[in-house]
């Protein structure tokens, strides 16, 4: 029996990739709480300069990830997804190690860009599982996998803050590098993939990739949906703490309250994603997608009228439960509308749109709040999500009419 004929235990692969996504999500978010403090430690002084450099080192990772993702996706379709997981985990571990040794802000900025270039563990994990899991279980599997990165991202800031308080800023980068190296070892020893490498000549070009899609217009609308989900999430991030302070008034534990309100959507998504993914397998991911978008609009609008932090926390928890269904539903629809031959590139294109949303969302939120106040951000974000709901519904309706 040849290696390519050996049956794959996709459930074991799902467990290991979930753990890998958890460690990657935790590793990325470990350093987030003190990023501005590390920028300051590297010699940046002055309020405006500190804000500018903090914004740059945060956003440049997503920008370079958006640029690099299609290249890595193409390579994954040629060489296999496991090797891309190994490349990503080891590359990020080395870069994190070097970040802990940075001597000035320019070195740190270049390393943050390099982190974006070498990243891509989670989209490649999605592509691997999407090509191995039975189609009728795609929603549940991708929903479950999404909880790995979410739970890692939730625990990461807490662990990072505690580690930084006890050991200092630089050691946290070394700890993060160790976490990513563990991710590399888990992938190397436990993930199995039957993949026959494809020669460069046999690879489909971009036009052929588009032509091979069952519904190119629908796939493009799914990419746009991913972008808008991230824009909607990111637009609130820059103003959340300030908005909570405005609602709470003069309280001593504002950091704790803000942190809790920031984290509740992730907790809700963690609970809802596998269940709604399973429901999507039963009734169709397109229905889950449209309903979740509409619910998001209905929850965003009242956020601009809340009077207490606890009202905001409740609405954000419900929003997180709806959001937990969105990206898995998009990914499941991408699986349904593409072939295994191009899965790496399709998921990498989706990641590029996600990264662009991660860059533009905070910029949009900051600009709106500066001009019209905090409450306007929620109304504008609701409008953007409503546009996306109508656009997605129209694209899915066209697809249904074409099938009929």
Swiss-Prot record:
Keywords, comma-separated and alphabetical: Cell inner membrane, Cell membrane, Membrane, Transmembrane, Transmembrane helix, Transport
Gene Ontology CC, one term: plasma membrane
Gene giving rise to this polypeptide: mdtG
Listed PANTHER family: MULTIDRUG RESISTANCE PROTEIN MDTG
Protein name per Swiss-Prot or TrEMBL: Multidrug resistance protein MdtG
Transmembrane segments: 19-39, 56-76, 90-110, 113-133, 144-164, 171-191, 222-242, 254-274, 288-308, 317-337, 376-396
Keyword Transport among record annotations: yes
Pfam families (UniProt xref): MFS_1, Sugar_tr
Entries under HAMAP family matching the protein: MFS_MdtG
Lineage, broadest ranks: Bacteria, Pseudomonadati, Pseudomonadota, Gammaproteobacteria, Enterobacterales
GO molecular function terms noted in the UniProt entry: transmembrane transporter activity
Subcellular location: Cell inner membrane
Recorded family membership: Belongs to the major facilitator superfamily. DHA1 family. MdtG (TC 2.A.1.2.20) subfamily.
Membrane topology: Multi-pass membrane protein
NCBIfam families (alphabetical): PRK09874.1
Broad class of where this protein is predominantly found: membrane
Originating species: Salmonella typhimurium (strain LT2 / SGSC1412 / ATCC 700720)
Superkingdom as given in the UniProt entry: Bacteria
Record flagged with keyword Coiled coil: no
